[in-house]
Amino acid sequence: MTLSVPDCAEMNRIRMSNHRKMSLGSAPLIANGRPSPPPRRTSLAESIRTLAFTARRNSSPLYRKSTKKLKKSRLVGKNGICNVYNTNVPKKDRQYLRDIFTTMIDVKWRWMLMLFASAFVLSWSIFGTTYYLIALVHGDLSLPTPVNHTACVMNLDSVYSSFLFAVETHHTIGYGHRYITTECYLAGAIVCLQAICALLLQSFMVGIVFAKMARPKKRAETIIFSDKAVICLRDGQLCFLCRVGDMRNTHLVEAHVRLQFITDRETNEGEIEPLHQFEMKVGPSIADDDRLFLVWPTTLCHVIDSRSPLYNYNQQTLMSAQFEIIVLLEGIVESTGMTAQAKTSYLPSEVLWGHRFRKLVTYQRSNGSYQIDYDLFHSTYPVRTPAMSPAEFYSSKPNLKDYYCHDSHEHKLEDNRSSDSTPLPSPSPYSYPSTPLNHFQSSSNSPVFSNNHSKFNTEAVTCEAGMLCPPTIVVQCPSTCASPNHMRRTRNQMDKSRTSSSCDLTRPSTALSDLEEECSDSGSPTKCQSPPVVPIHIEIVSET
């Protein structure tokens, strides 16, 4: 015996057929053979409440349709809007009315303009009705006008004319056909009162409109954050990186950034503290300095050390973690002097382990300026990064040569995007010895020097620490230099044509200041325009 299970389309057809039968009056039978009870009738108030709840649920950003994949809830959206709602606040309306100025600034433009239009119409109606009652009591509306009778307001004979007189008084348009006389002191007092109320109402409206237009909320929308954050090695330390940029030419003054790590925390007594905030030290480099110079896009760096909340997360546990990292950027708007705040957040699924951000800045030699390509603002590329947690990585004492990955291909991409070649980056102080002079004064057993000669082995320096040493400038000591603190270094003789058109090469340019201090009469080195291609051999001469 074969059982056939109806598909979803057939089940929907059967359900619609049963619903149609119920609407026609034939009640279907239930399992025990008894007819189903009639549906409960709902009241009008209950139906209105149900419709209001459905409309509010559909318009809420928390609502997710069943046909779509459910997304993880977050406290702060990518656009900076906080996903937090307050309920059951005692005396909320009363507190909002006490702070009416802030309430009016926070409401939307359409509600604010509608409220002000209603306030104007209400003011005109109240004072127009007052003028009409004064004219009615004074007898100005009687059809047979008495002889030698002076009205309080001339030519005010209907409700509409009194309304127009109130509008003229409110906006100081100027009296024409209708004007006030000195017959009634009460009418004059009402005119003065209306002038004061109109002045207060217009001042309040202008102040709110100006404050609403000048607030830096829209200025914060021109600050963009990267869609993804990355974790990679930087100077031998695992770092959490994200990128921030400002699209405007008027920059933020005294900009500083903060990182908040939000997760549930369990105390020693077993109490679960929801949404606990951990402060994460962050800055534009590995130094703990939260101040930014936001002229070009900056990569924010948080060093993952023992004090970091990311210290025990590895590549696998990061994907199943439950936390949220909120980035807060604050600064003073240069044009208005007001404080602007931009914020975003990153979930564990938005943190890429073992990636770097692509470079945006391209030097244009044609006009001497720097070009920023925002098409690559969110782009990353994978690099060699340990998959273990920072705690395990630091305790294992790894060899950093295994994770070295020079981004020379990024500079080639910059050369292709630029109209002219991009200048070489300055050497990093982490790639070279701290005392270059001692590096050259090493013993003969060092792999940098050959066994039988005191010549400098360029291949050993090139492969030292797994890093490529870029071409650098040499400073020749003058013949009159008699300093006993360093050795004389001379070059092998080369072709005269090459010597006249090229510059000498030796160690990094960061050592120039050492040589200048040791040689009192040495001149400033000449700039290198076209470095030679062939390697330069350097001889070590003993002290004189």
From Swiss-Prot:
GO terms for cellular component: monoatomic ion channel complex; neuron projection; neuronal cell body; perikaryon; plasma membrane. Residues 1-109, 209-544 are cytoplasmic. Disruption phenotype: Strongly suppresses the egg-laying defect caused by a mutant form of egl-6. Very mild defect in egg-laying behavior when deleted in a wild-type background. The chain crosses the membrane at residues 110-134, 187-208. Expressed in neurons in the head and tail with no expression detected in non-neuronal cells in these regions. Also detected in the egg-laying system of adult hermaphordites with strong expression in the HSN motor neurons and weak expression in vulval muscles. One of its GO terms (biological process) is regulation of G protein-coupled receptor signaling pathway. One of its GO terms (molecular function) is inward rectifier potassium channel activity. PANTHER family: INWARD RECTIFIER POTASSIUM CHANNEL, INWARD RECTIFIER POTASSIUM CHANNEL IRK-1. It holds the Pfam family IRK. It is found in: Membrane; Perikaryon; Cell projection. The keyword DNA repair does not apply. Residues 411-448, 512-533 are annotated as: Disordered. Residues 438-448 have a biased composition (Polar residues). Residues 135-158, 178-186 are extracellular. Belongs to the inward rectifier-type potassium channel (TC 1.A.2.1) family. It comes from the Eukaryota. It is a multi-pass membrane protein. A motif (Selectivity filter) lies at residues 172-177. Gene3D superfamilies: 1.10.287.70, G protein-activated inward rectifier potassium channel 1 (2.60.40.1400). Keywords: Cell projection, Ion channel, Ion transport, Membrane, Potassium, Potassium transport, Transmembrane, Transmembrane helix, Transport, Voltage-gated channel. Residues 159-170, 171-177 dip into the membrane without crossing it. It comes from Caenorhabditis elegans. This is Inward rectifier potassium channel irk-1. Coiled coil: none annotated. Inward rectifier potassium channels are characterized by a greater tendency to allow potassium to flow into the cell rather than out of it. Required for modulation of the activity of the hermaphrodite-specific neurons (HSNs) by the G-protein coupled neuropeptide receptor egl-6 which in turn controls egg-laying behavior. InterPro entries: Ig_E-set, IRK_C, K_chnl_inward-rec_Kir, K_chnl_inward-rec_Kir_cyto, Kir_TM.
